[in-house]
Amino acid sequence: MSSLTEYHILNLGAGVQSTALYLMACTGEIHAIDHAIFADTGEEPGAVYKHLEWLKSLNGPPIMVRSAGKLGDDLRRGRNTTGGRFAAIPCFTQAEAGAEVGRTRRQCSKEYKTEVIERAIRRDVLGLDPRKRIPKGTHVSQYFGISWDERSRASRTRP
């Protein structure tokens, strides 16, 4: 008997790439996933929520929807998910004619996506209380749908 406990989790953005991975897992084209987790910013287009409902209707691997709150509300309040500093979204500054346009600093992916999914894995999948260590012999593989043109966004495996 193996002492290794494995979990296979799909970070589901409900876009083309993560949807393809979800469907491939449903049909056995890739390793089966135990859960798909959608981090809801509360500001996704209606078509994303409709698509998410369609995916759920396929009765494939369970899809968890988790949220850190509504990004737009935090932006209007000038606060982030912890109630401190600013809510940083990806946006661009408007420039006068001929001037260079810049992008503001952004952190929403970390606060509204990455941390939400990591918390769901730790609490909902592994059943861990906050600040508890993952038990020895437990391995979590996360699947991300990233296309070739987005490869610079991909990061290496971390222990």
Question: Language-model segments: which ranges?
Answer:
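ATP-dependent adenylation/nucleotidyltransferase module used to activate substrates
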Residues: 1-159
